[in-house]
Structure formats: C-alpha cells, structure tokens
Design a protein with these regions (language model features):
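General marker for long, soluble alpha-helical cores
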Residues: 1-23, 27-179
Length: 179
C-alpha cells in the first residue's frame, strides 16, 4: 500500500483524481483514521474542495477534526482557492506514511486491548490538546480522562459546559505542555 501511495500520489492533482485511485485514496483515509468513511467518496470530495475560511463550508460544518487534518495536509483548497498541491514533497510523503503506520499500530493494539489503545491514542494526541472541548470531542480521550481523574462515566450525559467544568476543576490542561 505504501509503495502504491508513494508511486502514484504525485500524479494526483484534484480530490476527484484522489478518489478515483482507490488504493491511494484508501491509504490516505487510513492515515487520517478515516477508514470508517472510505465509502463516503462524495462527502470526502466535497470536504476536500471546501473553502477552509468560509464558515458555512462543509469542512467547517464537520465537527470531526480528522477531516480538517486531512484537508490541510492535502491542500487541494486553501484560503486562496483551489490549488494543485505538490504531493511529491518528501516531507508530505513521510508525514502521511508515518501517520498511516502510527494509526495502524494504535488500531491494532486497540482491537486487542482497549485500554492499551486508549493510552496510545492519548499519547498520539496529547501534545495537540489545547482545550477540554477537544478532549470531549473524542470518546477515547474523554474515557482516558474520566478514568485518570476518577470521574464517573455517567458525566458524559451532562451538558458539555458542565463536563468541561468538571474536567477543568480536576486537571489543568497546561500541565500537558510540560510533561
């Protein structure tokens, strides 16, 4: 899969072309942990074509941060409009392949032991966590903090602002910046 990705991604110049090459498309989707969305090709194409600065664009209406990460990494559309990104850049290729293997490792471990998967997920995401709403957007991260901070699972039924307040009372997220 990696060989096909590296060999053919450079020939792709649009979201439509990416989706047409199922092997490359699948590799990219798995790299961004969007395997469960692989068959939503229309949604993915529209998301990749979305204007990242237009508040009502599809990209900005999607709440799952994985879509934004993929959109930014591929760069088919920027604030300047549609682009033809350089998908042969070695840094881009290495970033996507590293993401792919990290994600496969996390998912395989999660399938065998959910606790290990949760810890690996936390390790993968913790440096990018800026606020409690980012934690609450991820079921795994929410679960991790509930267990780590001895908070009841039932708190997930509360209003998001109340959940945020409970978490903030127990732990200062700024402590994650200095492990």
């Amino acid at each position: 899969a990696e060989e096909a990705f590296r060999d053919r991604i450079g020939d792709i110049s649009s979201p439509e072309e990416l989706i047409a090459d199922f092997e490359v498309y699948s590799f990219v989707m798995r790299a961004f942990d969007l395997e469960d969305q692989i068959f939503g090709k229309g949604l993915i194409r529209k998301m990749l074509e979305s204007d990242p600065v237009e508040p009502s664009s599809l990209l900005n209406r999607l709440t799952d941060s994985r879509f934004r990460e993929m959109h930014l990494a591929l760069g088919f559309t920027t604030e300047a409009g549609p682009q033809t990104p350089d998908l042969t850049d070695p840094d881009f290729l290495n970033d996507v392949t590293t993401r792919f293997y990290n994600r496969q490792y996390i998912n395989e471990n999660d399938a065998q032991n959910e606790t290990v998967g949760t810890v690996l997920e936390f390790r993968d995401k913790f440096s990018g966590i800026d606020n409690w709403f980012e934690v609450l957007a991820s079921e795994k991260l929410t679960n991790f903090f509930q267990v780590a901070l001895s908070l009841p699972e039932q708190m997930s039924a509360l209003d998001l602002d109340k959940q945020k307040a409970l978490l903030a009372d127990k732990f200062d997220l700024e402590k994650l910046a200095d492990p």
